[in-house]
Amino acid sequence: AILLNNNGHHVNVWSVFPDEVELLAKERENKKCLPGVHIPENIEFSADTEYVVEKSDVIVLAVASPYTRSTAKLFAPYVKKGQYIVNVGKGIEEDTLMTLCQVVEQEIPQCTAAVLSGPSHAEEVGRMIPTTCVIGTHKKEDAEYLQNIFMNDVFRVYTSPDMLGICIGGALKNVIALAAGIADGLGYGDNTKAALITRGITEIARLGIAMGADPMTFTGLTGIGDLI
């Protein structure tokens, strides 16, 4: 939200929890997730789903993966044909094994779905630390339109038509990251983590290719970059 506000866009932040909306609007700081980062006064907060969706040209969907479908269902009645929905969550839906973008497209077929992913910790983006990401859409012109909205001097955005590969890389890297954390906890060293990373990205790429993704996606920001 801060990034888009700094780029000159009017931003409405939505939450399903009215108490959270009221607290953020009053304190102008997310003390739980982004302590010390001031939220500009011109960013609005609302729990009114219809108002926020209908007022927006681009919706950035930033919810935990188990709630992607329920949130998409909540938005669906108000989304206009062709309206952009950019998913930034990472995961696979447990019951269906669908990517989060596939879930969005299933629940909101009238939207233009996109995914923004890469090595991008929210707290670093909020503090304007240089970051690079990839935006994926089915059509090149949509990717370039969204690229111009998000990109600035400290947030570099590349484009890709491989939405499937971007989603797979972002979701499956979590498994390898957990393994690397376990290796740390067991007192293992760099040798072990190097093996986990290199063999892990190989497994991710094999699965992605089998599902129809572009092999090159997994050597880039949303593959090895996100994993590191």
Model-found features: residue ranges?
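Short, charged/polar "capping" segments at the starts of alpha-helices
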Residues: 19-23, 94-95, 143
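NAD(P)+-binding Rossmann beta1-loop-alpha1 motif at the extreme N-terminus of oxidoreductases
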Residues: 1-37, 43-47
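Rossmann-like NAD(P)(H) cofactor-binding subdomain of soluble oxidoreductases
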Residues: 39, 45, 49-54, 58-130, ...
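C-terminal substrate-binding/catalytic lobe of Rossmann-fold NAD(P)-dependent oxidoreductases
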Residues: 212-228
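Cofactor-binding loop segments of dinucleotide-utilizing enzymes, especially the Rossmann-like FAD-
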Residues: 16, 90, 138
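Internal alpha-helical scaffold of NAD(P)-dependent oxidoreductase catalytic cores
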Residues: 67, 78, 103-111, 130-216
